[in-house]
Amino acid sequence: MIVTGESSGELYGALLADELSALWPDIRLIGVGGERMKKAGVELFSGIASSFGITEAIPTYRSVRDAYRKTVNALKAERPDVVVLIDYPDFNFRVGREARRLGSRVLYYVSPQVWAWRSGRVKTIQKVAERIAVLLPFEEKIYREAGMPCEFVGHPVLDEIGLLPRDKGELRERLGLDAERPCVALLPGSRNHELKKLLPVMLGVVRRARAEL
């Protein structure tokens, strides 16, 4: 079982499903996710439903509650050998506790940013998962020092970047970027609410900067 609740986690879930299916062609994968995971062969019993901020959380509460109920029902009915929880901590912490109570092994994949805020969540993760696989090298030290089995597995996006030229000039040429001018990337986030609220502000800053520089 693979459980995630937002777009970025779903991308990791789809890539993971592809790799698992390549290693074990007969494997059966079920979970919570979106179209990418479905295309990767995961049988979905619930779609993803994430929120960002207080006002956005209100309309999604029912869908999150419904997703949790369906997940618990699937845990009881399917009794998966392994449950992989991808980020989405507030939801997945509850799923992990229930999965372990029912006898499934639990792997947490993609650590919440415990190094940035709410570091106490390390202890919570120790209770809901047996092991954790992290994307950033320094995260491994954090969990190992806390006594939790942990392995640095690298960031999946590097596999995608690996398809691009390593040379900066060649990359700029392929992307149609001026080699002599500074390059700024706008990264508003992966959630719909982030895109709707943050991207217009970022674009406004870019327009203002262009006018003043």
Where are these regions (language model features)?
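Active-site and donor-binding regions of nucleotide-sugar-utilizing enzymes
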Residues: 1-175, 187-195
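Short hydrophobic signal-anchor/transmembrane segments that target glycosyltransferases
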Residues: 19, 197-213
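Charged active-site motifs of nucleotide-sugar-dependent glycosyltransferases
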Residues: 178-185
